[in-house]
Protein backbone atom coordinates (compact mmCIF):
# COMPACT_ATOMS: atom_id res chain seq x y z
CA UNK A 1 0.00 0.00 0.00
CA UNK A 2 2.88 2.38 0.70
CA UNK A 3 4.10 2.14 -2.88
CA UNK A 4 0.72 1.99 -4.62
CA UNK A 5 -0.87 4.80 -2.65
CA UNK A 6 2.21 6.96 -2.32
CA UNK A 7 1.35 7.41 1.36
CA UNK A 8 3.93 7.02 4.12
CA UNK A 9 1.99 5.06 6.71
CA UNK A 10 4.56 5.78 9.40
CA UNK A 11 3.73 9.49 9.20
CA UNK A 12 0.02 8.99 9.96
CA UNK A 13 -0.80 9.94 13.58
CA UNK A 14 -2.60 7.57 15.92
CA UNK A 15 -6.26 7.26 14.87
CA UNK A 16 -5.47 9.45 11.87
CA UNK A 17 -5.91 8.58 8.23
CA UNK A 18 -5.20 9.62 4.67
CA UNK A 19 -7.76 9.22 1.88
CA UNK A 20 -6.18 9.46 -1.55
CA UNK A 21 -7.32 8.86 -5.11
CA UNK A 22 -4.78 7.16 -7.37
CA UNK A 23 -6.00 6.58 -10.92
CA UNK A 24 -9.34 4.77 -10.52
CA UNK A 25 -8.67 3.64 -6.96
CA UNK A 26 -9.28 5.27 -3.59
CA UNK A 27 -6.89 4.34 -0.80
CA UNK A 28 -8.01 4.74 2.82
CA UNK A 29 -4.77 4.58 4.76
CA UNK A 30 -4.26 4.25 8.48
CA UNK A 31 -4.24 1.68 11.24
CA UNK A 32 -7.10 0.25 13.29
CA UNK A 33 -9.39 3.15 14.21
CA UNK A 34 -7.76 5.33 11.56
CA UNK A 35 -9.00 3.16 8.69
CA UNK A 36 -12.48 3.07 10.22
CA UNK A 37 -12.66 6.85 10.62
CA UNK A 38 -11.24 7.33 7.15
CA UNK A 39 -13.98 5.12 5.73
CA UNK A 40 -16.67 7.23 7.40
CA UNK A 41 -15.04 10.40 6.11
CA UNK A 42 -14.99 8.89 2.62
CA UNK A 43 -18.74 8.24 2.95
CA UNK A 44 -19.25 11.80 4.16
CA UNK A 45 -17.54 13.33 1.14
CA UNK A 46 -18.81 10.82 -1.41
CA UNK A 47 -22.37 10.14 -0.21
CA UNK A 48 -23.11 12.99 2.23
CA UNK A 49 -23.02 10.60 5.20
CA UNK A 50 -23.55 12.18 8.62
CA UNK A 51 -24.87 10.70 11.86
CA UNK A 52 -26.93 13.07 13.99
CA UNK A 53 -28.54 10.54 16.34
CA UNK A 54 -29.07 6.81 16.65
CA UNK A 55 -32.17 7.08 14.47
CA UNK A 56 -31.05 9.92 12.20
CA UNK A 57 -28.34 9.16 9.68
CA UNK A 58 -28.08 11.31 6.57
CA UNK A 59 -26.99 9.57 3.38
CA UNK A 60 -27.50 10.15 -0.33
CA UNK A 61 -29.90 7.38 -1.30
CA UNK A 62 -31.13 5.88 -4.57
CA UNK A 63 -28.09 7.28 -6.36
CA UNK A 64 -27.77 6.00 -9.93
CA UNK A 65 -24.96 8.16 -11.28
CA UNK A 66 -22.08 9.20 -9.05
CA UNK A 67 -18.72 10.68 -9.93
CA UNK A 68 -15.86 9.58 -7.71
CA UNK A 69 -14.38 12.42 -5.67
CA UNK A 70 -10.71 13.14 -6.30
CA UNK A 71 -9.46 12.56 -2.75
CA UNK A 72 -6.24 13.83 -1.24
CA UNK A 73 -6.89 14.54 2.43
CA UNK A 74 -5.50 13.64 5.83
CA UNK A 75 -7.00 14.10 9.26
CA UNK A 76 -6.55 13.04 12.88
CA UNK A 77 -8.38 13.85 16.12
CA UNK A 78 -7.42 16.78 18.32
CA UNK A 79 -8.23 14.66 21.39
CA UNK A 80 -7.12 11.06 21.14
CA UNK A 81 -9.84 9.34 23.16
CA UNK A 82 -13.31 10.86 22.97
CA UNK A 83 -16.00 9.37 25.15
CA UNK A 84 -19.69 9.96 24.32
CA UNK A 85 -21.43 12.12 26.88
CA UNK A 86 -24.88 10.53 26.74
CA UNK A 87 -26.01 6.95 27.23
CA UNK A 88 -27.82 6.25 23.99
CA UNK A 89 -24.65 6.74 21.96
CA UNK A 90 -22.39 4.54 24.05
CA UNK A 91 -22.69 1.37 21.95
CA UNK A 92 -19.63 0.37 19.95
CA UNK A 93 -21.53 0.86 16.68
CA UNK A 94 -22.75 4.36 17.54
CA UNK A 95 -19.32 5.39 18.77
CA UNK A 96 -17.73 4.20 15.54
CA UNK A 97 -20.25 6.06 13.42
CA UNK A 98 -19.70 9.26 15.43
CA UNK A 99 -15.90 8.76 15.42
CA UNK A 100 -15.87 8.39 19.19
CA UNK A 101 -13.96 5.76 21.15
CA UNK A 102 -14.57 5.85 24.87
CA UNK A 103 -14.33 2.06 25.28
CA UNK A 104 -10.73 2.14 26.46
CA UNK A 105 -11.27 0.80 29.98
CA UNK A 106 -10.47 -2.68 31.23
CA UNK A 107 -12.77 -3.81 34.02
CA UNK A 108 -14.22 -7.08 35.20
CA UNK A 109 -17.10 -5.71 37.23
CA UNK A 110 -18.13 -2.94 34.83
CA UNK A 111 -17.24 -0.17 37.25
CA UNK A 112 -14.64 1.83 35.36
CA UNK A 113 -14.33 4.63 37.95
CA UNK A 114 -14.68 4.85 41.73
CA UNK A 115 -13.51 1.27 41.68
CA UNK A 116 -10.76 0.99 44.31
CA UNK A 117 -13.05 -1.31 46.31
CA UNK A 118 -15.00 -3.23 43.66
CA UNK A 119 -12.13 -3.88 41.29
CA UNK A 120 -9.11 -4.05 43.60
CA UNK A 121 -9.95 -4.29 47.31
CA UNK A 122 -13.46 -5.71 47.75
CA UNK A 123 -14.48 -5.48 51.38
CA UNK A 124 -15.99 -8.94 51.23
CA UNK A 125 -12.50 -10.31 50.65
CA UNK A 126 -10.23 -8.09 52.72
CA UNK A 127 -12.13 -6.10 55.33
CA UNK A 128 -12.24 -8.80 58.00
CA UNK A 129 -8.44 -9.11 58.05
CA UNK A 130 -7.23 -5.73 56.75
CA UNK A 131 -9.85 -3.29 58.04
CA UNK A 132 -7.41 -1.40 60.28
CA UNK A 133 -4.58 -1.25 57.73
CA UNK A 134 -5.84 -1.10 54.15
CA UNK A 135 -8.98 0.99 54.63
CA UNK A 136 -9.48 4.54 55.88
CA UNK A 137 -10.48 5.18 59.48
CA UNK A 138 -14.16 5.39 58.52
CA UNK A 139 -13.89 2.52 56.04
CA UNK A 140 -15.10 4.63 53.11
CA UNK A 141 -11.79 4.88 51.19
CA UNK A 142 -8.51 3.04 50.98
CA UNK A 143 -5.65 4.05 53.21
CA UNK A 144 -2.94 4.73 50.65
CA UNK A 145 -0.19 4.59 53.29
CA UNK A 146 -1.36 1.38 55.06
CA UNK A 147 -1.17 3.36 58.32
CA UNK A 148 2.53 3.88 57.70
CA UNK A 149 3.28 0.14 57.79
CA UNK A 150 5.83 -0.49 55.02
CA UNK A 151 5.20 -4.25 54.82
CA UNK A 152 1.44 -3.82 54.54
CA UNK A 153 1.88 -1.05 51.98
CA UNK A 154 4.00 -3.39 49.86
CA UNK A 155 1.27 -6.04 50.10
CA UNK A 156 -1.35 -3.51 48.98
CA UNK A 157 0.77 -2.41 46.06
CA UNK A 158 1.40 -6.00 45.01
CA UNK A 159 -2.34 -6.69 45.19
CA UNK A 160 -2.93 -3.84 42.75
CA UNK A 161 -0.10 -5.00 40.49
CA UNK A 162 -1.43 -8.54 40.27
CA UNK A 163 -4.94 -7.28 39.61
CA UNK A 164 -3.65 -5.10 36.77
CA UNK A 165 -1.95 -8.12 35.24
CA UNK A 166 -5.16 -10.16 35.53
CA UNK A 167 -7.17 -7.51 33.72
CA UNK A 168 -4.64 -7.13 30.91
CA UNK A 169 -4.45 -10.90 30.42
CA UNK A 170 -8.25 -11.10 30.38
CA UNK A 171 -8.62 -8.49 27.63
CA UNK A 172 -5.47 -9.08 25.61
CA UNK A 173 -6.20 -12.82 25.71
CA UNK A 174 -9.20 -12.23 23.45
CA UNK A 175 -7.38 -9.66 21.29
CA UNK A 176 -9.13 -6.71 22.94
CA UNK A 177 -6.23 -4.28 23.26
CA UNK A 178 -7.71 -1.54 25.37
CA UNK A 179 -5.41 1.09 26.78
CA UNK A 180 -6.43 2.06 30.30
CA UNK A 181 -7.27 0.67 33.74
CA UNK A 182 -8.82 2.95 36.32
CA UNK A 183 -7.62 2.81 39.93
CA UNK A 184 -9.75 5.58 41.36
CA UNK A 185 -11.05 6.42 44.82
CA UNK A 186 -14.62 5.99 45.96
CA UNK A 187 -17.17 8.72 45.25
CA UNK A 188 -18.49 11.25 47.78
CA UNK A 189 -16.28 9.98 50.61
CA UNK A 190 -13.50 11.71 52.59
CA UNK A 191 -9.92 10.54 52.29
CA UNK A 192 -8.15 8.72 55.10
CA UNK A 193 -7.10 10.84 58.11
CA UNK A 194 -4.81 8.38 59.88
CA UNK A 195 -1.50 9.72 61.20
CA UNK A 196 0.49 8.57 58.16
CA UNK A 197 -1.97 10.00 55.62
CA UNK A 198 -2.26 13.22 57.62
CA UNK A 199 1.53 13.56 57.62
CA UNK A 200 1.57 13.18 53.82
CA UNK A 201 -1.11 15.83 53.48
CA UNK A 202 0.71 18.15 55.86
CA UNK A 203 3.95 17.83 53.90
CA UNK A 204 2.49 18.13 50.39
CA UNK A 205 -0.65 20.15 51.00
CA UNK A 206 -2.92 17.57 49.40
CA UNK A 207 -4.30 14.06 49.81
CA UNK A 208 -3.22 13.36 46.24
CA UNK A 209 0.43 12.92 47.25
CA UNK A 210 -0.32 9.67 49.08
CA UNK A 211 -2.09 8.30 46.00
CA UNK A 212 0.85 9.23 43.76
CA UNK A 213 3.37 7.70 46.16
CA UNK A 214 1.25 4.54 46.24
CA UNK A 215 0.83 4.11 42.49
CA UNK A 216 4.22 5.20 41.09
CA UNK A 217 6.14 2.07 42.23
CA UNK A 218 3.27 -0.12 40.98
CA UNK A 219 3.37 1.64 37.61
CA UNK A 220 7.10 1.03 37.20
CA UNK A 221 6.75 -2.70 37.88
CA UNK A 222 3.67 -2.91 35.70
CA UNK A 223 5.46 -1.28 32.77
CA UNK A 224 8.34 -3.75 33.04
CA UNK A 225 5.92 -6.68 33.05
CA UNK A 226 3.87 -5.29 30.14
CA UNK A 227 6.95 -4.65 28.00
CA UNK A 228 8.13 -8.23 28.57
CA UNK A 229 4.73 -9.92 28.22
CA UNK A 230 3.07 -7.83 25.51
CA UNK A 231 5.82 -5.94 23.65
CA UNK A 232 4.64 -2.86 21.78
CA UNK A 233 1.51 -2.33 23.86
CA UNK A 234 0.86 0.48 26.30
CA UNK A 235 -1.67 0.60 29.15
CA UNK A 236 -2.29 3.55 31.44
CA UNK A 237 -3.11 3.19 35.12
CA UNK A 238 -5.48 6.08 35.72
CA UNK A 239 -5.86 7.90 39.04
CA UNK A 240 -8.25 10.69 40.01
CA UNK A 241 -7.67 14.35 40.82
CA UNK A 242 -11.12 14.61 42.34
CA UNK A 243 -12.92 16.07 45.35
CA UNK A 244 -10.67 15.61 48.43
CA UNK A 245 -7.71 14.72 46.21
CA UNK A 246 -8.14 17.45 43.59
CA UNK A 247 -5.23 19.67 44.66
CA UNK A 248 -1.87 19.08 42.95
CA UNK A 249 1.34 18.75 45.02
CA UNK A 250 3.18 21.73 43.53
CA UNK A 251 4.69 24.98 44.73
CA UNK A 252 5.63 28.30 43.15
CA UNK A 253 9.30 28.86 42.44
CA UNK A 254 10.53 31.89 40.50
CA UNK A 255 6.95 32.59 39.45
CA UNK A 256 6.41 29.10 38.03
CA UNK A 257 4.63 26.01 39.30
CA UNK A 258 7.07 23.21 40.08
CA UNK A 259 6.70 19.83 41.84
CA UNK A 260 7.17 19.99 45.60
CA UNK A 261 9.76 17.25 45.09
CA UNK A 262 10.61 14.61 42.51
CA UNK A 263 8.59 11.89 44.27
CA UNK A 264 5.30 13.44 43.15
CA UNK A 265 6.20 13.53 39.45
CA UNK A 266 3.75 11.04 38.00
CA UNK A 267 5.06 8.09 35.99
CA UNK A 268 4.49 8.24 32.24
CA UNK A 269 2.16 5.23 32.28
CA UNK A 270 -0.07 6.77 34.94
CA UNK A 271 -2.93 8.87 33.60
CA UNK A 272 -4.06 11.81 35.73
CA UNK A 273 -7.84 12.11 35.46
CA UNK A 274 -8.82 15.66 36.45
CA UNK A 275 -12.51 15.94 37.36
CA UNK A 276 -13.36 19.51 38.49
CA UNK A 277 -16.56 18.50 40.26
CA UNK A 278 -17.23 21.93 41.76
CA UNK A 279 -16.54 24.06 38.67
CA UNK A 280 -19.18 26.39 37.21
CA UNK A 281 -20.37 24.75 33.99
CA UNK A 282 -22.52 27.66 32.91
CA UNK A 283 -19.18 29.36 32.17
CA UNK A 284 -16.06 28.15 30.39
CA UNK A 285 -12.80 27.46 32.19
CA UNK A 286 -11.32 30.81 31.20
CA UNK A 287 -14.10 32.70 33.01
CA UNK A 288 -13.19 34.26 36.34
CA UNK A 289 -15.62 31.94 38.12
CA UNK A 290 -13.41 29.02 37.10
CA UNK A 291 -9.99 30.54 37.70
CA UNK A 292 -9.29 28.12 40.54
CA UNK A 293 -10.04 25.09 38.38
CA UNK A 294 -8.00 26.26 35.42
CA UNK A 295 -5.06 26.94 37.73
CA UNK A 296 -5.47 23.49 39.27
CA UNK A 297 -5.25 21.95 35.81
CA UNK A 298 -2.11 23.95 35.10
CA UNK A 299 -0.60 22.65 38.32
CA UNK A 300 -1.31 19.05 37.42
CA UNK A 301 0.21 19.57 33.97
CA UNK A 302 3.52 20.32 35.71
CA UNK A 303 3.77 16.83 37.20
CA UNK A 304 1.99 14.82 34.49
CA UNK A 305 2.17 14.71 30.70
CA UNK A 306 -0.61 12.13 30.55
CA UNK A 307 -3.80 14.05 31.26
CA UNK A 308 -7.39 12.84 31.18
CA UNK A 309 -10.29 15.28 31.66
CA UNK A 310 -13.78 14.75 33.07
CA UNK A 311 -16.21 17.66 32.70
CA UNK A 312 -19.99 17.91 33.17
CA UNK A 313 -22.82 18.98 30.88
CA UNK A 314 -25.98 17.89 32.71
CA UNK A 315 -27.87 18.95 35.81
CA UNK A 316 -27.62 15.96 38.11
CA UNK A 317 -30.04 17.47 40.60
CA UNK A 318 -32.73 17.93 37.92
CA UNK A 319 -31.87 15.39 35.28
CA UNK A 320 -34.60 16.18 32.75
CA UNK A 321 -34.05 19.94 32.75
CA UNK A 322 -32.02 22.01 30.31
CA UNK A 323 -28.45 22.65 31.41
CA UNK A 324 -26.95 25.21 29.06
CA UNK A 325 -23.37 24.19 28.45
CA UNK A 326 -23.70 24.85 24.71
CA UNK A 327 -21.72 28.09 24.89
CA UNK A 328 -18.75 26.53 26.67
CA UNK A 329 -18.18 23.31 24.75
CA UNK A 330 -16.01 24.72 22.00
CA UNK A 331 -13.90 26.80 24.41
CA UNK A 332 -13.40 23.99 26.92
CA UNK A 333 -12.53 21.46 24.22
CA UNK A 334 -9.91 23.84 22.83
CA UNK A 335 -8.50 24.10 26.33
CA UNK A 336 -8.35 20.30 26.48
CA UNK A 337 -6.43 20.20 23.21
CA UNK A 338 -4.03 22.89 24.38
CA UNK A 339 -3.30 20.85 27.52
CA UNK A 340 -2.68 17.78 25.31
CA UNK A 341 -5.53 15.95 27.00
CA UNK A 342 -5.47 12.29 26.02
CA UNK A 343 -9.04 11.38 27.02
CA UNK A 344 -12.16 13.55 27.35
CA UNK A 345 -15.41 12.60 29.05
CA UNK A 346 -17.94 15.45 29.01
CA UNK A 347 -20.38 13.80 31.40
CA UNK A 348 -24.00 14.15 30.35
CA UNK A 349 -27.00 11.89 30.87
CA UNK A 350 -24.81 8.84 30.58
CA UNK A 351 -27.06 6.27 32.26
CA UNK A 352 -30.27 6.68 30.27
CA UNK A 353 -31.40 6.26 26.70
CA UNK A 354 -34.38 8.59 27.19
CA UNK A 355 -32.75 11.61 25.62
CA UNK A 356 -34.28 14.85 24.39
CA UNK A 357 -33.54 16.39 21.01
CA UNK A 358 -31.19 18.86 22.65
CA UNK A 359 -29.38 16.01 24.43
CA UNK A 360 -28.74 14.58 20.99
CA UNK A 361 -27.49 17.98 19.89
CA UNK A 362 -24.98 17.93 22.73
CA UNK A 363 -23.92 14.43 21.74
CA UNK A 364 -23.45 15.56 18.15
CA UNK A 365 -21.42 18.61 19.20
CA UNK A 366 -19.45 16.46 21.63
CA UNK A 367 -18.44 14.14 18.80
CA UNK A 368 -17.67 16.81 16.21
CA UNK A 369 -15.82 19.23 18.51
CA UNK A 370 -13.74 16.64 20.33
CA UNK A 371 -12.47 15.48 16.93
CA UNK A 372 -11.89 19.02 15.63
CA UNK A 373 -12.04 21.70 18.30
CA UNK A 374 -11.88 24.39 15.60
CA UNK A 375 -14.91 23.07 13.69
CA UNK A 376 -17.43 25.70 12.58
CA UNK A 377 -19.80 25.73 15.56
CA UNK A 378 -22.52 27.76 13.83
CA UNK A 379 -22.49 25.41 10.84
CA UNK A 380 -22.76 22.39 13.12
CA UNK A 381 -25.85 23.88 14.74
CA UNK A 382 -27.42 24.65 11.36
CA UNK A 383 -26.77 21.14 10.06
CA UNK A 384 -28.21 19.50 13.14
CA UNK A 385 -31.45 21.48 13.25
CA UNK A 386 -32.03 21.00 9.52
CA UNK A 387 -31.47 17.25 9.57
CA UNK A 388 -32.79 16.31 12.99
CA UNK A 389 -35.91 18.48 13.28
CA UNK A 390 -36.60 18.74 9.52
CA UNK A 391 -39.95 20.55 9.00
CA UNK A 392 -39.86 21.71 12.63
CA UNK A 393 -36.42 23.26 12.18
CA UNK A 394 -37.45 26.94 12.40
CA UNK A 395 -39.60 26.88 15.57
CA UNK A 396 -37.22 24.51 17.37
CA UNK A 397 -34.28 26.74 16.48
CA UNK A 398 -36.19 29.76 17.81
CA UNK A 399 -36.88 27.86 21.02
CA UNK A 400 -33.22 26.85 21.34
CA UNK A 401 -31.86 30.33 20.62
CA UNK A 402 -34.36 32.00 22.93
CA UNK A 403 -33.51 29.66 25.78
CA UNK A 404 -29.81 30.38 25.41
CA UNK A 405 -30.48 34.12 25.22
CA UNK A 406 -32.47 33.85 28.44
CA UNK A 407 -29.65 31.97 30.14
CA UNK A 408 -27.20 34.69 29.10
CA UNK A 409 -29.59 37.24 30.60
CA UNK A 410 -29.75 35.30 33.88
CA UNK A 411 -25.98 35.08 34.07
CA UNK A 412 -25.57 38.78 33.30
CA UNK A 413 -28.13 39.93 35.88
CA UNK A 414 -27.41 37.44 38.66
CA UNK A 415 -23.74 37.07 39.49
CA UNK A 416 -24.57 34.51 42.18
CA UNK A 417 -26.41 32.17 39.79
CA UNK A 418 -24.87 28.77 40.58
CA UNK A 419 -23.50 26.75 37.69
CA UNK A 420 -22.30 23.55 39.31
CA UNK A 421 -23.63 20.33 37.88
CA UNK A 422 -25.50 19.70 41.13
CA UNK A 423 -26.89 23.24 41.58
CA UNK A 424 -30.61 23.91 41.53
CA UNK A 425 -31.49 26.93 39.38
CA UNK A 426 -34.93 25.89 38.18
CA UNK A 427 -37.13 28.30 40.13
CA UNK A 428 -40.10 30.51 39.24
CA UNK A 429 -37.87 33.52 39.81
CA UNK A 430 -35.34 32.37 37.21
CA UNK A 431 -37.93 31.00 34.79
CA UNK A 432 -41.14 33.05 35.10
CA UNK A 433 -44.40 31.82 33.63
CA UNK A 434 -44.42 34.19 30.66
CA UNK A 435 -41.02 32.92 29.55
CA UNK A 436 -42.13 29.30 29.78
CA UNK A 437 -45.32 30.12 27.88
CA UNK A 438 -43.25 31.69 25.11
CA UNK A 439 -41.24 28.50 24.79
CA UNK A 440 -44.41 26.41 24.83
CA UNK A 441 -45.60 28.49 21.89
CA UNK A 442 -42.50 27.52 19.92
CA UNK A 443 -43.17 23.87 20.75
CA UNK A 444 -46.78 24.20 19.55
CA UNK A 445 -45.51 25.81 16.34
CA UNK A 446 -43.17 22.87 15.85
CA UNK A 447 -46.05 20.42 16.16
CA UNK A 448 -48.03 22.48 13.64
CA UNK A 449 -45.08 22.47 11.24
CA UNK A 450 -44.96 18.69 11.09
CA UNK A 451 -48.75 18.15 11.01
CA UNK A 452 -48.91 17.82 7.18
CA UNK A 453 -46.52 14.87 7.40
CA UNK A 454 -48.99 12.80 9.42
CA UNK A 455 -50.75 11.57 6.29
CA UNK A 456 -47.90 11.96 3.81
CA UNK A 457 -45.17 10.22 5.83
CA UNK A 458 -46.54 8.83 9.11
CA UNK A 459 -43.31 7.09 10.08
CA UNK A 460 -41.26 10.28 9.90
CA UNK A 461 -44.09 12.20 11.57
CA UNK A 462 -44.03 9.91 14.60
CA UNK A 463 -40.27 10.21 14.82
CA UNK A 464 -40.34 14.01 14.68
CA UNK A 465 -43.25 14.20 17.12
CA UNK A 466 -41.12 12.43 19.72
CA UNK A 467 -38.21 14.82 19.15
CA UNK A 468 -40.18 17.97 19.93
CA UNK A 469 -40.04 18.78 23.62
Segments and roles (model prediction):
Residues 237-276, 320-325, 355-362:
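Substrate-binding cleft/loops of secretory-pathway carbohydrate-active enzymes
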Residues 215-251, 307-314, 344-347:
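Aromatic-lined carbohydrate-recognition surfaces of secreted/lumenal glycan-active proteins
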Amino acid sequence: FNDKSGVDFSSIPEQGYTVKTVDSNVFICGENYGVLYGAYDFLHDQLDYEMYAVDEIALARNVTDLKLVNFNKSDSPDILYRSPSNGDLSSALSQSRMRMNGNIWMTENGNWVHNSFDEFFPKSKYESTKRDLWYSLDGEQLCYTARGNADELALMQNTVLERLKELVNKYFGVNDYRGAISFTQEDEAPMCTCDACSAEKQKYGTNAAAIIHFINPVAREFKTWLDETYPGHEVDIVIFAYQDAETAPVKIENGQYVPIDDTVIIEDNVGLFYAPFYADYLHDFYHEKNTTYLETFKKWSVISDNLYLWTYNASFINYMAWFDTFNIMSVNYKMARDFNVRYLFDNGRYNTSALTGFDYLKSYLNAKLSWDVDADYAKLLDNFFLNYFKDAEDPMRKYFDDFRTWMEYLKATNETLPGRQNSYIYTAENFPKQVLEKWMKYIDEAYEAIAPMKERDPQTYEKLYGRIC
